[in-house]
From Swiss-Prot:
This is Chorismate synthase. NADP(+) binds at R39, R45. FMN binds at R130, S131, S132, N251, A252, G296, K311, P312, I313, P314, T315, R337. It catalyses: 5-O-(1-carboxyvinyl)-3-phosphoshikimate = chorismate + phosphate. GO terms for molecular function: chorismate synthase activity; FMN binding. Belongs to the chorismate synthase family. Its cofactor is FMNH2. One of its GO terms (cellular component) is cytosol. Homotetramer. It comes from Listeria monocytogenes serotype 4b (strain F2365). The gene is aroC.
């Protein structure tokens, strides 16, 4: 299973095409729209989210609420397009309009300058329109489809915010996926710790007042995962590696870790490895989950626990020093409409990309042509691993 996305931030809209879904899987537009709505929320979002009310149009691959096994095409309209029709026109425009909203002063930390050099764009709007995090709208749409597939197989995904601007949630126990879903949805910053959430919101407000931005850390937990997804046989078959790639592919994300993550470097092996248990009721389990649900690049039946770190958004309302690519003189960087903090929304995007990789791994391991046989094979595999 794979997908491609297309579209610019201020173009007519965004498109994704998914190939490889099994036939007969239940899927409605509402399954996607509820995830798009979640992505638009969160304390710290900018004015753009008051304009866009994202709704998906499914244009291919579904009939009467079920997938056909053919490519699924989805489109999300940009409501703000009406204000950008000339600037972002697909057809040629009069010469006097060609330089409207031209960007020649790249923003530090963004794709502007390097993208311009790579593709020869002397108007870096051609770069920023595609590199914008607006593209994650259709990544969330694709992830919503993956989450639906996983849900039907008894696998659930939830994300939440662990840290914003140096304030970290004080979590003294592990949370079930259902708890994470319920508690995070009730928080303006998608945080499980109400006290920390208040401090996070204050830091976001302070950053906005100062024309600055702040980043943070999100965590995604996947429960109900069968053992044996991914493989140790080749480096590029390891599922944790694929998930790590997916996490750092999200706009502004700079790192990923599983389980205790980088803390493992400061602990002896006896405090990191997860002891193996067995019972007739549950089969093989682990006493702890320090490795985040992975051993040898494969799922071990414990919940997947992965975290990603998001840098502060590079668009600053008090811009940093840059250079005009025309004159080579020093100027302040360009300013585009932006959020002061998008970490809460990014947790939804992280859910989507993790769900996608897990769904792909499921379809790689089991027959993926028909959804009814897929469900049967997953259940048979669960029983086999339990009886091993």
């Amino acid at each position: 299973m794979r997908y491609l996305t297309a579209g610019e931030s201020h173009g007519p809209g965004l498109t994704t095409i998914i190939e490889g879904l099994p036939a007969g899987m239940p899927l409605l537009a509402e399954d996607v729209n509820k995830e798009l709505k979640r992505r638009q929320g969160g304390h710290g979002r900018g004015a753009r989210m008051r304009i866009e009310k994202d709704q998906v149009q499914i244009t291919a691959g579904i009939r009467h609420g079920k997938t056909l096994g053919a490519p699924v095409a989805m489109f999300v309209e940009n409501k703000d397009w009406k204000h950008w029709e000339t600037v972002m026109s697909i057809e040629p425009v009069p010469e006097k309009n060609e330089k409207s909203r031209r960007v020649s002063r790249p923003r530090p930390g963004h794709a502007d300058l390097v993208g311009g050099m790579k593709y020869g764009h002397n108007d870096m709007r051609n770069v920023l329109e595609r590199s914008s995090a607006r593209e994650t709208t259709v990544r969330v749409a694709a992830g919503a489809v993956a989450k639906k597939l996983l849900h039907e197989l008894g696998i659930e995904v939830a994300g939440h915010v662990l840290e914003i601007g140096g304030t970290r949630a004080n979590l003294t126990r592990d949370y079930a996926v259902s708890e994470i879903q319920e508690t995070s949805e009730a928080s303006p910053v998608r945080c499980l710790d109400g006290v920390a959430a208040e401090e996070m919101m204050q830091k976001i407000d302070d950053a906005k007042k100062n024309g600055d931005t702040i980043g943070g850390i999100v965590e995604v937990v996947v429960g109900g995962v069968p053992a044996g997804l991914g493989s140790y046989v080749q480096w590029d078959k390891k599922l944790d590696a694929k998930i790590a790639r997916a996490i750092v592919s999200i706009n502004a994300f700079k790192g990923a870790e599983f389980g205790v993550g980088f803390e493992a470097a400061r602990k002896p092996g006896s405090e990191v490895m997860d002891e193996i248990l067995w019972s007739k009721e549950d089969g093989y389990t682990r006493r702890t989950n320090n490795l985040g649900g992975f051993e040898g690049g494969m799922t071990n039946g414990m919940p997947i626990v992965v975290r990603g770190v998001m840098k502060p958004i590079p668009t600053l309302y008090k811009p940093l020093q840059s250079v005009d690519i025309d004159s080579k003189e020093t100027f302040n960087a360009s300013v585009e409409r932006s959020d002061s903090c998008a970490v809460p929304a990014a947790s939804v995007v992280a859910e989507a990309v993790v769900a996608w990789e897990v769904a792909v791994a499921v379809l790689e391991k089991f027959d993926g042509d028909r959804f009814d046989t897929l469900k049967k094979h997953v259940e048979e595999h669960r029983n086999l691993t339990k009886e091993f």
